[in-house]
Amino acid sequence: MDNATRHKVQRVRKRANYDRTAIYNILDASWLAHVSFASDGQPFVIPMLYVRDGDDLLLHGSIASRLLKSLGEGIEACVCVTIVDALVLARSHFHHSANYRSVVAFGNATPVTDLLEKSAALSGFVDAMLPGRAAEARPANRKELAATSLLRFRIVDASAKVRSGDPIDEPSDHSLPHWAGLLPLKQGYEKPISAADLNPEINTPVSVHAPS
């Protein structure tokens, strides 16, 4: 498959979307990606935190990782992000499925070495995980920044694929006495748990209170 068609959806093409706004909306709704690439002929898939910066994804990891060093050499890589919105429960086993939003992006990653850019990106990561949290915690110091690998992945080609709606049962199954429909899923927050060594005089901050 050549680079011009590598991102084209092959199965159920009506669910594909190549509009960058639609793609970026999905990317902005998550912060965990699976990054795949090959190093010395061996394929790898690494789960990584990310935050979008324009047409780039900033990927966060440890400077000690040999795999991240390989990825930072500019080799071809593929990033996948998936959000499951509902279980699709059909009248037949065959038509059970899931409603989802997904993005597959192709490109190359290069290391970010500027400490100021690294520091700003780490703040972005923290706020992507929990909006407002960056202002409530200490920024990374020079030693921590030096120990952090930050990769800038340029999105060259990308596609979104979205399934929504009811199960698609066979018409002959509509009269069966089996329930069919959707079981929506939602990622949420539970009650915060303070660290065991936290000063008891420190109250739960606004960013942690807000979503719980």
Task: Give each language-model segment a name.
Residues 31, 46, 53-55, 73-77, ...:
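A generic structural signal for short beta-strands and their flanking turns/coil linkers
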Residues 56-58, 78, 161:
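General beta-strand recognition
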Residues 48, 83, 155-157:
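Residues immediately flanking
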Residues 50, 107-109, 151, 155:
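A structural signal for short, well-ordered beta-strand segments
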Residues 63-124:
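Short, structured beta-strand-loop surface elements
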Residues 3-58, 69:
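An N-terminal domain-cap segment
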Residues 1-7, 113, 117-212:
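C-terminal edge-of-domain segments
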Residues 57-61, 151-152:
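A generic structural motif
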